[in-house]
């Protein structure tokens, strides 16, 4: 039983690539044909690659390490946030701030600032401060929440990263590689699959296609975490 069926992939439009003039020759092996000036992705290969990525993601989740979901393009933002939250993982869906992985110290300082502002608001400090100052602090808090909210509770560097569109998330991928963090992701016909450790050929511009594949990776995390919990329970018996 495959993780995602051919029917699901077709219905979500995963097979539609980019225009033939916008392509990366390294994607040739994943292209089935060309239709009306658009490349059609070979979904049999997509099914296989989804399964490989699923198995790997599940194994990482079994170790208890966090997995970071990254997708800042409009078509990916909701799926990245929703699916990361569904599997209890972390995400970046607004903008990748340079150094999010490689300059952990600076990012940690900003996260601490966000926590401090949250605490001030919870404890009613905002109610006694001058209105002008509160407006400024709220704006700062909202900005920090927007960019760092999805990673503020991440306990350590991720064991793996999932990305939508490596062209868009190039800096994130470079940082992951520098730290030896494996990267899984969706690659359209204009991408370089060699940038990723586990490349899933597919349409990275259709919301349904992105949601389907991101959802499969989130399910892999849930399955991996459950497996790890069951092992712990058995050990304790």
Swiss-Prot record:
Keyword terms: Ribonucleoprotein, Ribosomal protein
Q: Which PROSITE patterns does this chain map to?
A: RIBOSOMAL_S2_1, RIBOSOMAL_S2_2
Pfam families to which the protein is assigned, alphabetical: Ribosomal_S2
Q: Which Gene3D superfamilies match?
A: Glucose-6-phosphate isomerase like protein, domain 1, Helix hairpin bin
Q: Which SUPFAM superfamilies match?
A: Ribosomal protein S2
Q: Which GO terms describe its biological process?
A: translation
Can you quote a single GO CC term? Answer: cytosolic small ribosomal subunit
The family database entries (HAMAP family) matched by this protein are listed as: Ribosomal_uS2_B (MF_00291_B)
Protein name in the entry: Small ribosomal subunit protein uS2
Q: Which family does it belong to?
A: Belongs to the universal ribosomal protein uS2 family.
Q: Which GO terms describe its molecular function?
A: structural constituent of ribosome
């Amino acid at each position: 039983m495959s993780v995602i069926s051919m029917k699901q992939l077709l219905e979500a439009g995963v097979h539609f690539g980019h225009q033939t003039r916008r392509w990366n020759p390294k994607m040739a092996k994943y292209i089935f044909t060309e239709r009306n000036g658009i490349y059609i992705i070979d979904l049999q290969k997509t099914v296989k690659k989804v399964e490989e990525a699923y198995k790997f993601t599940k194994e990482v989740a079994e170790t208890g390490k966090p997995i970071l979901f990254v997708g800042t393009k409009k078509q990916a933002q909701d799926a990245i946030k929703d699916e990361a939250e569904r599997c209890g993982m972390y995400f970046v869906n607004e903008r990748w701030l340079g150094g999010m992985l490689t300059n952990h110290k600076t990012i940690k300082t900003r996260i601490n600032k966000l926590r401090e502002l949250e605490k001030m608001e919870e404890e009613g400090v905002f109610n006694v401060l001058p209105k002008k100052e509160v407006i400024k602090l709220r704006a700062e808090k909202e900005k920090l929440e927007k960019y760092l909210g999805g990673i503020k509770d991440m306990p350590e560097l991720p064991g793996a990263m999932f990305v939508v569109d490596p062209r868009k998330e190039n800096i994130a991928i470079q940082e992951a590689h520098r730290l030896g963090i494996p990267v899984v992701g969706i690659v359209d016909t204009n991408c370089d699959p060699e940038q990723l450790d586990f490349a899933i050929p597919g349409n990275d511009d259709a919301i349904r296609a992105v949601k389907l594949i991101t959802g499969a990776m989130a399910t892999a995390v849930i399955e991996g975490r459950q497996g790890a919990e069951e092992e712990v329970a058995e050990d304790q018996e």
